From Swiss-Prot:
Pfam families: Fe-S_biosyn, NifU
Cofactor note: Binds 1 [4Fe-4S] cluster per subunit. The cluster is presumably bound at the interface of two monomers.
Keyword annotations of the record: 4Fe-4S, Iron, Iron-sulfur, Metal-binding
Function comment: Involved in iron-sulfur cluster biogenesis. Binds a 4Fe-4S cluster, can transfer this cluster to apoproteins, and thereby intervenes in the maturation of Fe/S proteins. Could also act as a scaffold/chaperone for damaged Fe/S proteins.
Binding positions for [4Fe-4S] cluster per the UniProt entry: C151, C154
Upper lineage: Bacteria, Pseudomonadati, Pseudomonadota, Gammaproteobacteria, Vibrionales
Gene: nfuA
Subunit structure: Homodimer.
Full protein name: Fe/S biogenesis protein NfuA
Cofactors required: [4Fe-4S] cluster
InterPro entries the record matches: Fe/S_biogenesis_protein_NfuA, FeS_biogenesis, FSCA_dom_sf, HesB-like_dom_sf, NIF_FeS_clus_asmbl_NifU_C
Stored PANTHER family: FE_S BIOGENESIS PROTEIN NFUA, IRON-SULFUR CLUSTER SCAFFOLD PROTEIN NFU-RELATED
Record-linked SUPFAM superfamilies: Fe-S cluster assembly (FSCA) domain-like, HesB-like domain
GO molecular function: 4 iron, 4 sulfur cluster binding; iron ion binding
Length: 194
């Protein structure tokens, strides 16, 4: 069974929308370009004739959500919510594993560190047009990373590395990582955030 959460407010929203569709229409949750930096999640109507034998059905009160077998592992721990604030209402879909498949706790250190970078660190850097890639982990337990995009040449990169990335990684990999170092040649340019 899949670990996809649809909040009660989102379930009510979907039930209302589906009430205006032909009988038997449900929803489909999917990932386009799963496992890549260009991964995008979506929700669409799913008429009965669009259901495939390999789809996973997640039943809810009044409707079902269908997920194709390729998207399923990338939607692990996904949450769909319908939030209302002063600005209006919107559907939110958080899928922390859309760009990279979740790795097991006993996976090699390099895979676990790469997973944390792609799912926790890079989404924060993306707001500034930046990203970081894991280059290697040395025998001494030092994670060597390279910054790219808006982070390359940014004057705040040292703070981001020490106060953000290193603190996060050392916290999550106690006893396995000893430090995080930057391998990037920082040339300031128009692309730099600060």
């Amino acid at each position: 069974m899949s670990n996809i959460t649809i909040t009660e407010t989102a379930q009510t929203h979907f039930a209302n929308l589906l009430g205006q569709q032909p009988e038997g229409t449900n929803i489909r949750i999917f990932v386009v370009n799963p496992g890549t930096q260009n991964a995008e999640c979506g929700v669409s109507y799913c008429p009965p004739e669009a259901v495939e034998a390999t789809d996973t059905e997640i039943p809810y009160a009044g409707f079902s959500a269908y997920v194709d077998e390729l998207s399923l592992p990338f939607l692990e721990d996904a949450e769909i919510d319908f939030v209302t604030d002063k600005m209006g209402s919107q559907l939110t879909l958080k899928a922390p594993n859309a760009k990279m498949r979740k790795v097991s706790d006993d996976a090699p250190l390099v895979e676990r560190v790469e997973y944390v970078i792609q799912t926790q660190v890079n989404p924060q850097l993306a707001g500034h047009g930046g990203h970081v890639n894991l280059v290697e982990i040395t025998e001494a337990g030092v994670a060597i990373v390279a910054f790219g995009g808006g982070c390359n040449g940014c004057s705040m990169v040292d703070v981001t590395l020490k106060e953000g990335i290193e603190k996060e990684l050392l916290n999550q990999f106690v006893g396995e990582l000893t430090a995080v170092r930057d391998a990037t040649e920082h040339d300031r340019g128009d692309h730099s955030y600060y």
